[in-house]
């Protein structure tokens, strides 16, 4: 009888963002007759943590350092390595599965353990500019398997890595969405509702979203963003501009639970993605599944998902042009079953089967 492989997943926090939700779905779906699973989080308090299966071993890797830690480091002790050793001594993994390029630095510790390594890349070019060159060198030299989230990422890495690369097409958990939508809350009021979702950041185009809202100040259209504020200057500036009343028909909803999130999504008349760059774009897929047409800027990933069955990709980022596209789509009807069929090629169960084969062979 074959021995089960022990996989230790590393990820940021299991909050409800695209990369974290994909990782959660993988952890939840892997065949327990083939794999034992542990997960290491860099931060506590993730929204998905309470929903982890009971058989998952949960660890926290402290990423901050006290004054005493810094003194020990200057005396020659590798504090982070010792923290990893404590986790590894308890779990005794065969594979480290590292989620997102931000955590690629963990690959430098692999030489201290008898493990294989996987790195799951959800990011695209903009994100690579934000990390050190050493992280890419580690990806190339130290990852036994690199897993990309879309064909866009595949184009970046396939020729470079050869058989060390595979694409795991990101997909949404439609069964979970269905459970969240068993009770539908009717939309209040008669305003047209335009929704966006994701971290309130420059890459996601929050500034474009806000500028667009001003074209509808004297209409019955409201703009709602579902997402959390990061702690940076860009977010702080725009948060204060909203508080000052510059964007009167914009709401930021950052405290919704999962059911409230999907109900808000389904209650929209249009989903608006203003992203400057996406490697995929799961929130657009969620909107389409909920029967909400999508207007998306040409972010890369949007062209993989959005078509004339479910919305439109706009190749002009100017708010004047986008505002006209919004008006056009608000007056156009879409058929929900055709919308869902338009994204049916993104099959999460099939992707899990492919991933299990890779993990079994590594």
Predicted regions and their residues:
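Conserved acidic donor-binding segment of nucleotide-sugar-dependent glycosyltransferases
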Residues: 308, 312-319, 328-333
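A conserved mid-protein helix/loop that constitutes part of the nucleotide-sugar donor-binding site
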Residues: 20-25, 201-215
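Short, structured helix-loop element that forms part of the nucleotide-activated donor/catalytic region
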Residues: 50-51, 224-248, 260
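Short alpha-helical donor nucleotide-sugar binding micro-motif in glycosyltransferases
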Residues: 255-256, 263-268
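Glycosyltransferase donor-sugar binding loop
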Residues: 40-46, 197, 222-236, 254
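Aromatic "clamp/platform" in nucleotide-sugar-dependent glycosyltransferases that forms part
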Residues: 276
